[in-house]
Swiss-Prot record:
Species of provenance: Idiomarina loihiensis (strain ATCC BAA-735 / DSM 15497 / L2-TR)
Family under the similarity heading: Belongs to the transferase hexapeptide repeat family.
Coiled-coil positions: none
Family annotation (InterPro entries): DapD_Trfase_Hexpep_rpt_fam, Hexapep, Hexapep_transf_CS, THP_succinylTrfase_dom1, THP_succinylTrfase_N_sf, Trans_hexapeptide_repeat, Trimer_LpxA-like_sf
Entry protein name: 2,3,4,5-tetrahydropyridine-2,6-dicarboxylate N-succinyltransferase
Amino acid sequence: MENIKQRIIDAFEQRDQINARTENDDLREAVRYVIDEIDRGELRVAEKVSGEWVVHQWLKKAVLLSFRLNDNDLIEGGETRFWDKVPAKFADYDSARFRAEGMRVVPPAMVRKGAFIGRNVVVMPSYVNIGAHVGEGTMVDTWATVGSCAQIGKNVHLSGGVGIGGVLEPLQANPTIIEDNCFIGARSEIVEGVIVEEGAVISMGVYIGQSTRIYDRENDRILYGRVPSGSVVVPGSLPSANGTHSLYAAIIVKRVDAKTRAKVGINALLRSAE
């Protein structure tokens, strides 16, 4: 694996000289191997090590190189066709393979090759991009988007129209991460490498990027880029220093533990946010 890693790192430094006509079978095989391993869930662009998220930048480089190396090709999809560099994940699946991997995919959902879909995941008509990892038991609801290299944990609910930001460029940016047992409400957007920690509940219509103020009203503090575990978050606003106007903020209205969350429905938690 170290040889493959170094080959990809070296090639990425010369990426401007690489295109679909490049004759380098070793590089093509290395990139193909990495994409296949991400697709199977054996490799992840980001993973938790000793309680901290670690991003493997070389895997992002492999994904980017695949765009340089691959030419557009015809992709069949139901009643229509597509012209793209990345094939559909399920292009070669038959019923036996779908049953063996234990997922449910509802038409016209689109999952690109190089995205991992865990067991008991339900993919409604939605979009999952290359490099993403969707953990077992998760619901990707209708018109949700899971961006490139985004990491979605186990037993997560991504409600209708949710957007989880992708990140391939700029390369130094970290992927957006939704940890296990989170609920993301309809039409919410979590982007720019924000981490939503385990068991958090995000209400409908909450937008969080790296510059979004996340106000913890219980502790009277402002956070950036991270929603703490067990937080219940709703959209709101905070006043300006001179009191002339207010600007958007995400508001942590309460914290819940796993026991409370198991006993109380998501809607009840949000209705009692006051």
